[in-house]
From Swiss-Prot:
SUPFAM superfamilies: DTD-like. NCBIfam families: D-aminoacyl-tRNA deacylase. It holds the Pfam family Tyr_Deacylase. It comes from Azoarcus sp. (strain BH72). Belongs to the DTD family. Its EC number is 3.1.1.96. InterPro entries: Daa-tRNA_deacyls_DTD, DTD-like_sf. This is D-aminoacyl-tRNA deacylase. GO terms for molecular function: D-tyrosyl-tRNA(Tyr) deacylase activity; Gly-tRNA(Ala) deacylase activity; Ser(Gly)-tRNA(Ala) hydrolase activity; tRNA binding. It is found in: Cytoplasm.
Length: 151
């Protein structure tokens, strides 16, 4: 399972003109389930995300986690993170989990995030979404927990 994290001062996602999720300072996590992923990969990815030290401490060093700063978490599903661009000019998404598996893992990830962190907002799985953000830094970090079957 993978995520592209962006440290933000604010972010929101809209579907059909209606805001479905919005945060202030925190992390925007674009999340993708891959072929072979299970809840175990989702749990490991979330644990890493919540503890990743990407926020500044008093000295200006990236030394504080999302949990330590009490920031918001905006989780948006994005199967295109699994794109394979090695052949031709059209990306292949064959590495992404099937839609039903992707939805189940996304919902599991969000439920666990809500159980472990205060402020969690979301997009809508499978919808065409508009994501607005102000990237702080900019800080953009890819995270990936490979499926156990690929290890």
């Amino acid at each position: 399972m993978m995520a592209l994290l962006q440290r933000v001062t604010r972010a929101r996602v809209t579907v059909d003109g209606a805001t479905t999720g919005e945060i202030g300072t925190g992390l925007l996590a674009l999340v993708c389930a891959e072929q072979g992923d299970t809840e175990a990969e989702a749990d490991k990815l979330l644990a890493k995300l919540l503890k990743l030290r990407v926020f500044a401490d008093e000295g200006g060093r990236m030394n504080r986690s999302l949990q330590e700063v009490g920031g918001g978490l905006l989780v948006v599903s994005q199967f295109t993170l699994a794109a394979d661009t090695s052949g031709g000019n059209r990306p292949s998404f064959a590495n992404a989990a099937p839609a039903d598996t992707g939805r189940a893992l996304y919902e599991h990830f969000v439920a666990r995030a809500r159980a472990q962190h205060g402020e969690v907002a979301t997009g809508r799985f499978g919808a065409m979404m508009q994501v607005e953000l102000v990237n702080d830094g900019p800080v953009t970090i890819p995270l990936r927990i490979p499926p156990a079957s690929a290890a």
